[in-house]
A protein has these predicted regions:
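Beta-strand-rich modules
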Residues: 460-477
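N-terminal secretory signal peptides
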Residues: 1-14
Length: 489
């Protein structure tokens, strides 16, 4: 096992010396998530490296029992079937930061990979690092900590109060360091544990020096992972300034780095979970549960709600049955990332393909959005409108108007809808809402239920006919053709 010691590096390469130019076909493949093989482009002979990538498994000790093992184990067995060379786990292993929770994760790891070997006897490398939950829980008095254990002395068994080096050696048979460097089949991985005493913030102390000391080969990709993401790489946060982010500044010197971030629990069906700027980054989904972008009537939280003073009319979408993971395959000329619905053993969308050497910005939001197609409803699809008595998210009983519609799945080269724009209009009145579908975080073959958007009756004008139109939108906000309008009352 690598002990985290690294060498001093020479000068770094410029961005343009690494990135090349792409054909239009490759750019379209990157936007649509298509494998260039299908487009007849030149490819390497075979995979050089296979890595399972997952995050936020949240092993949980609750009432002296452990939870969280089902989907973690299932993801590991999928990686075993695909003959992964390594598994990268991007933090939040222990939900409440308890030693017992980390021990449980190690137990499951060795259950699937006894002696650190796959079922075919070949070795597999564990590339684990800690997140804020691992060093949080009781230590930072998070409100969810009370659920973690009935043991009043549980804080004394928290990782933050223990010798993490001794625990890491005991569980994973390797030395622990705040930033560890490993090499798998000639490819380097720089793994940054979440800082022990950081309850807020993202800065990794010593990151720039560690990246330089790792001395990555400029002619091939290398990999970096930390738990909390660079905010400007998050879906819905792409416009946030990166200029003062110390992690971003350190990574921006290496156009050949592929960074994996956890923490955000974003739906990997969202194309913006793949980001490219000065380097390339992936926001890794949670194998435990999903969160969503804000700003939708049924967003996971009220964050980014355009009108925070108004109670949302819908409960948050049920993301607790979302269990996702990724699988990364490295070739000489490309990296391919498969997106997985672990619960249903199905794809969450077309594979992402990152050409090597990567074109200048071809995987950026701007480039992919420019060539992305809008989703479309199936032919003959219709919306309906009804009235009911219900409760808004503030649990207030209100009269509501419900617009119901079918999901817009991928077809004819068009993508699955990420969300839906529902417009209520009347003379002198217009109200726009956005919603996620009921099962947006499941593989689309499992998304069979009707979805809806709920309006408060008091939000609509009295004495006027209100017309509702529904349009499906892709990850970049581009909406397709609307369903035939429906009127109320």
């Amino acid at each position: 096992m690598n002990n985290g010691r690294v060498k001093i590096v020479g000068p770094t390469l410029s961005r343009r010396s690494f990135f090349g130019r792409a054909t239009a076909a490759t750019a379209m493949a990157a936007a649509a998530g298509c494998d260039p093989l299908r487009l007849g482009l030149a490819t390497s002979d075979g995979p050089r490296l296979r890595v399972g990538v997952l995050s936020d498994i949240h092993m949980l000790r609750q009432k002296d029992a452990m939870k969280g093992e089902i989907w973690f184990e299932k993801a590991l067995r999928w990686y075993d079937e695909l003959k992964a060379d390594a598994v990268l786990l991007c933090g939040d292993i222990a939900d409440c930061g308890l030693v017992a929770e980390l021990e449980y994760a190690a137990e499951i790891w060795y259950k699937v990979f006894p002696g650190g070997k796959r079922s075919d006897g070949e070795p597999i490398e564990q590339l684990f690092h800690l997140g804020d939950h691992d060093f949080g829980g009781f230590a930072h008095k998070y409100p969810w900590a009370a659920k973690c254990s009935t043991d009043p002395d549980a804080v004394n068994h928290a990782l933050v109060n223990e010798d993490i080096g001794a625990i890491w050696r005991r569980l994973f048979n390797e030395e622990w360091a705040p930033i560890q460097v490993k090499e798998v089949k000639g490819y380097k991985f720089v793994l940054a544990h979440h800082p022990r005493n950081m309850s807020k913030g993202t800065a990794i102390p010593g990151l720039a020096e560690a990246l330089a000391a790792a001395n990555p080969d400029p002619s091939k990709p290398f990999f970096y992972s930390m738990h909390r993401p660079v905010h400007g790489t998050l879906p819905g946060w792409s416009g946030k300034s990166l200029e003062n982010d110390v992690n971003h500044k350190a990574l921006a010197k290496y156009p050949n780095v592929l960074a994996f971030f956890g923490h955000a629990h974003q739906n990997c069906a969202d194309e913006l979970c793949l980001w490219q700027g000065e380097y390339t980054a992936v926001n890794v989904p949670s194998t435990s549960y999903c969160c969503t972008r804000g700003g939708r009537e049924n967003s996971f939280s009220c964050a980014n709600n355009p009108d925070k003073k108004r109670p949302q009319q819908m409960d948050r979408v049920d993301c607790m049955t979302s269990n996702q993971a990724l699988f990364t395959t490295v070739y000489d000329d490309r990296i391919v990332i498969a997106r997985r619905d672990v619960r249903h053993d199905a794809s969450m969308g077309p594979d992402w393909t990152i050409p090597l050497p990567s074109p200048d910005g071809s995987c950026s939001e701007m480039e992919r959005a420019a060539i992305a197609l809008p989703p479309e409803f199936p032919e003959g699809a219709k919306a309906t409108v009804s009235e009911r008595k219900g409760k808004n998210r503030a649990r207030q009983e209100v009269d509501q108007v419900v617009v119901t519609f079918p999901p817009a799945h991928s077809r004819d080269g068009r993508p699955r809808a990420l969300d839906y724009e529902v417009v209520a209009s009347a003379k002198g009145f217009k109200l726009v809402r956005r919603v996620f579908s009921t099962r947006a975080y499941w593989a689309e073959g499992e998304e069979r239920e009707q979805s809806c958007c709920v309006f408060g009756r008091s939000e609509l004008p009295e004495g006027k006919i209100v017309t509702f139109t529904v349009r499906p939108a892709n990850s970049y906000g581009l909406a397709g053709a609307p369903l035939p309008p429906v009127r109320f009352p």
